[in-house]
């Protein structure tokens, strides 16, 4: 392709790109339909401040450039990462996409991260705590970052994920950042099956949350179980709510008061009798 004829695209930050992307992917599926491309590019060009007189001409060129350089999938869906690279710098692209390319496997893993960065146990992640999370994230991916850039990216992430604009992230905001997979407990219907089926399901559930394989749930394992249990009846929970329910669960289930929930203790709480 003759590069002299390609439109030169400006650069947005991740927050600007996300603002446009959400218009087309409101429920965060991670893709838009190919038929929406024209409208998407039009909104992006408007966001970049493209002059109205050249916008329509550029629209065709930008779409042509995308279709030529990207291996668009055959299912008519355009993934976020296929479009983000056209408008974002490498670091901004990483900020937006790391969550989709490194999804968490379980709520236990999620709660380990939550407890680590909610250092003051306030039930929220402050801007300073988010900065620490991002610093560790860049280090983990072997990416060098200056303190000035780190400050800038912290602000960008707050713009994207702090939905109520109170300057801090709650449990649900962080779950969106980390692309937590679907609630494990949704696949079970404990009240709609036989005793044997309930016992079998209980074994699967306990094995899933007992990540350390000690025969007891402790620390983030209890947190992960509590989070998923609560979200079955209340889709949006806060860190403060989670801590309260965790305390109630331990009070009722932790019979020997060791701060853990043994397998037999949890079974008793759920009204099951299991073989020792």
Curated annotation (Swiss-Prot):
Superkingdom of the source species: Eukaryota
Residues annotated as binding Ca(2+) 5: 210, 212, 214, 221
Positions that bind Ca(2+) 6: 254, 256, 258, 260, 265
Xref: Pfam families: EF-hand_5 (PF13202), EF-hand_7 (PF13499)
Cell location: Cytoplasm; Secreted; Cytoplasmic vesicle, Secretory vesicle membrane
Binding site for Ca(2+) 1: 25, 27, 31, 36
Keywords, comma-separated and alphabetical: Calcium, Cytoplasm, Cytoplasmic vesicle, Membrane, Metal-binding, Repeat, Secreted
Principal cellular location given in the protein's record: cytoplasm
Classification via InterPro entries: Calbindin_Ca-bind (IPR051001), EF-hand-dom_pair (IPR011992), EF_Hand_1_Ca_BS (IPR018247), EF_hand_dom (IPR002048), EFh_SCGN (IPR035798)
Residues given in the record as Ca(2+) 4 binding sites: 162, 164, 166, 168, 173
Binding positions (Ca(2+) 3): 118, 120, 122, 129
Matching Gene3D superfamilies: EF-hand
GO annotations of cellular component type: cytoplasm; cytosol; dendrite; extracellular region; nucleus; synapse; terminal bouton; transport vesicle membrane
Ranges of residues in domain EF-hand: 12-47, 58-93, 105-140, 149-184, 197-232, 240-276
SUPFAM superfamilies from the UniProt entry: EF-hand (SSF47473)
An example Gene Ontology molecular-function term: calcium ion binding
Membrane topology: Peripheral membrane protein
Protein name, as recorded: Secretagogin
